């Protein structure tokens, strides 16, 4: 079994609902410039150009007839999370991974989940620019997180029907963002994105950090 297969099966082992979905190692081949969700879809490493940093986060995703599945394997020597979780706002000061979905690149409407190392979530909807509704949440998203020797793994799934109802055209294309916040013991933070930009400071609520995605 390849290293990439081991990674996704470690994440899948956290979920009974992942079942026996088989995945193989490899990079997503793309489709007319799109990131194609398939058994080999992967993003190996995120970027913080504003801090001149890259990390070793491995993001993988695949789908079946009902759900879109995703996992992050994060290398982090200082996992930062709250022992006393008092609600979704707690996630704002923790290490976390983030996934954004938007029907259009303009981000007229977009939907976000920010997930800490233990699988606890802050989810919300937004309208460009930063018109956020923290009262909104995914109905079908299921999440789990687990600390590892080298950091943590987060895995999740969301119903494809829910994504469609949110306006995402899964087969013909929608926009997705993959991000990470890495807090340190002094509470400084590095912000990582799958898409590297020329910005001098991080801002994930803008179209430039999203990438075009299709689900086969």
What does each of the following model-derived ranges do?
Residues 1-2, 29:
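Accessible peptide chain termini
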Residues 2-12:
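Bacterial N-terminal signal peptides that target proteins for export
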Residues 10-20:
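Bacterial N-terminal signal peptides
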Residues 25-216:
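Structural preference for beta-rich elements and adjacent junctions enriched in aromatics
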């Amino acid at each position: 079994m390849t290293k990439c297969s081991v990674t996704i099966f470690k994440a899948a082992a956290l979920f009974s609902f992942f079942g026996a979905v088989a995945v193989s190692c490899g990079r997503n081949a793309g489709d007319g410039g799109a990131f194609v969700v398939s058994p080999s879809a992967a993003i190996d490493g995120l970027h913080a150009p504003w801090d001149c940093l890259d990390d070793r986060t491995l993001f993988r995703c695949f789908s079946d007839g009902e759900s879109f599945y995703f996992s992050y394997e994060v290398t982090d020597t200082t996992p930062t999370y709250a022992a006393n979780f008092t609600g979704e706002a707690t996630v704002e000061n923790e290490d976390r991974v983030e996934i954004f979905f938007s029907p259009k690149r303009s981000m007229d409407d977009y939907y976000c989940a920010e997930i800490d190392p233990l699988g606890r979530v802050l989810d919300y909807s937004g309208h460009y620019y930063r018109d956020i509704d923290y009262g909104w949440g995914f109905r079908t998203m299921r999440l789990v997180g687990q600390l590892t020797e080298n950091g943590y793994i987060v895995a999740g799934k969301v119903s494809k029907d829910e994504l469609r109802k949110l306006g995402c055209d899964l087969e013909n294309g929608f926009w997705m963002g993959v991000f990470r916040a890495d807090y340190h013991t002094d509470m400084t933070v590095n912000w990582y994105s799958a898409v590297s930009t020329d910005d001098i400071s991080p801002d994930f609520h803008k179209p430039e950090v999203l990438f075009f995605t299709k689900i086969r």
